[in-house]
Amino acid sequence: MDKFYVQLDSFSRQLVHDYEGVMTKVAKLGYNGIEIFYGLHGGYSPEGLKKFLNSINMEVISSHVETEDTEENLKYLPGTGCKYMINPGLAITSVQEAHEAAEFLNEMGRKAKSVGMKYGYHNHSNDFLKLGDKMICDILIENTDPELVAFEIDLAWAYRPDVDAAEY
């Protein structure tokens, strides 16, 4: 049976007022777990969050994190059982920047791997723009180590007339 997860950004305004109540409702909707969104973890310790989510039959699959919060998240997220630390997107405007971004993703992937997680990249529509003869997302995929970096394809951002999102 498939598992379904929800990104907490969908409920960010409600979560700040009633974290446990909102999460309990999310669990009752049939979700198996969450993707933490920029530190929305209800003020729980890592172990406390994992225990609370387990009590409502959910888990942390991933977390969107800002680059400047990487070190803090490398300490916090493993205790929650989180599997993926997700970069929310990069502003890439040249082939050189795309190659530099790929190396950055590999570097972050090595850090995530050192604590038992995998680093991921969340696309936006600009990642499907061509730089020369290749789309940015293709440059990133071709130049990152799949053992270190995963790609979280956001189908809404990938939906373009010239892109077959199913390929990704």
PLM regions and their residue ranges:
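N-terminal pre-domain/capping segments
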Residues: 1-83
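Hydrophobic/aromatic residues located in beta-strands of well-ordered beta-sheets
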Residues: 4, 60, 85, 119, ...
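Conserved beta-strand positions
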Residues: 8, 36, 87, 121, ...
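Short, small-residue-enriched loops and turns at beta-alpha junctions
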Residues: 12-14, 40-43, 67, 92-94, ...
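Charged helix-capping and loop-helix junction motifs
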Residues: 20-21, 47-51, 98-106, 133-138, ...
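Alpha-helix-loop-beta-strand connector modules within alpha/beta enzyme cores
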Residues: 47-65, 108-112, 137-147
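Glycine/small-residue-rich loop that forms an oxyanion/phosphate-binding "nest" at active or ligand-binding sites
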Residues: 70-106
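Acidic/histidine-rich catalytic cores of soluble enzymes
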Residues: 114-168
